[in-house]
């Protein structure tokens, strides 16, 4: 696990919060600045019992609060946020838990550095799932 980080009086100790918000689940994953060491990783599915609630804003909020508590324990006082949707040939908008997770991190007392959208956007995509005539209902 991560060691406790010592900071100077007025300086911030930064981590990177990677929020992956799909329509099925929300991941809140905090690493050090290089991304090599995981400090905390909690998902919406770890916080609620019903499968349908995994991607809900409430589950994302609980996950983010857990992650924030772990960050403070380790000594991280500020985070850069990278928010991501499924992307590629699928949805390029983050799921319902993305905004809630971001707000929960901000309200928990962690300072927010940069907020960046890192959804993978294809320059020229592979063929989309569903076939020539698309998904028929």
Swiss-Prot record:
Give the top-rank taxon of the lineage listed in the UniProt record for this protein.
Eukaryota
- The protein, known as: Small ribosomal subunit protein uS11
- An example Gene Ontology cellular component term from the record? ribonucleoprotein complex
Query: Keywords on this record?
Result: Ribonucleoprotein, Ribosomal protein
What are the GO BP annotations of this UniProt entry? translation
Q: In the UniProt record, does the keyword Ribosomal protein occur? A: yes
Enumerate the PANTHER family for this protein: 40S RIBOSOMAL PROTEIN S14/30S RIBOSOMAL PROTEIN S11
State the family it belongs to: Belongs to the universal ribosomal protein uS11 family.
PROSITE patterns for this protein: RIBOSOMAL_S11
Asked if the Swiss-Prot or TrEMBL record annotates the protein with the keyword GTP-binding, the reply is no
Q: Where is this region: Disordered?
A: 116-137
Where does this protein have compositionally biased stretches of type Basic residues?
Answer: 128-137
């Amino acid at each position: 696990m991560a060691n406790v980080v010592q900071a100077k009086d007025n300086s911030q100790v930064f981590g990177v919060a990677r929020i992956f918000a799909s329509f099925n689940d929300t991941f809140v994953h905090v690493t050090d600045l290089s991304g090599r060491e995981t400090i905390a990783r909690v998902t919406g599915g770890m916080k609620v019992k019903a499968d349908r609630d995994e991607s809900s804003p409430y589950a994302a909020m609980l996950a983010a609060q857990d992650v924030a508590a772990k960050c403070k324990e380790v000594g991280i006082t500020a985070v850069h946020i990278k928010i991501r949707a499924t992307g590629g040939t699928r949805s390029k908008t983050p799921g319902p838990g993305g905004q809630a997770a971001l707000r929960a991190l901000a309200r928990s007392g962690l300072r927010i550095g940069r907020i960046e959208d890192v959804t993978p956007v294809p320059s020229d995509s592979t063929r989309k799932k569903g076939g020539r005539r698309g998904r028929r209902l």
